[in-house]
Amino acid sequence: MNKWKKILMIEYNRLPDIFKNLKSKGLYYSLESGMFDWQFNGVYVFHLSCRGTTVYACYREWDIGPDEKCPVTNVGYFNDIRSEDDLYKIVDYKINFYSECLKEFKKRKIEVKKQELNKDFEAT
């Protein structure tokens, strides 16, 4: 069993502190089917999994329709993850990236809402 899968199988209360600290960033995860699933304020963000020697992140685009498939992105190779620090760097980078995506998405939604309200106002 490789190191990645071992990390995935560690029980919640024995997980490294950095994973427990994700809650302070407004994110949380669940251990399900050997994957870490992150959600941001209740919105599914992405999960990390390992197939062979490649680490993948499967994530939802903020504005995709319900019929669109969840895109899968290669976020690194297992051979490049020589320590837990390497794993944390990948995770931390992804969390920051998706946090920014969510902020942008909310901003866009607010802009669209304002435009709709303006149209309604002009029509009356």
Language-model features: locations:
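N-terminal Sec-dependent export signals
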Residues: 1, 95, 101-111
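Negatively charged, low-complexity tracts enriched in Asp/Glu with abundant Ser/Thr
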Residues: 1-40
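Residue-level detector of alpha-helical secondary structure
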Residues: 5, 12, 16-23, 88, ...
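Short acidic, low-complexity intrinsically disordered linear motifs used
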Residues: 104-124
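Generic alpha-helical secondary structure signal
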Residues: 16, 23, 32-33, 40, ...
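Intrinsically disordered, low-complexity regulatory segments enriched in Ser/Thr/Pro
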Residues: 37-97
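Intrinsic disorder/low-structure terminal segments
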Residues: 18, 27-28, 35, 39, ...
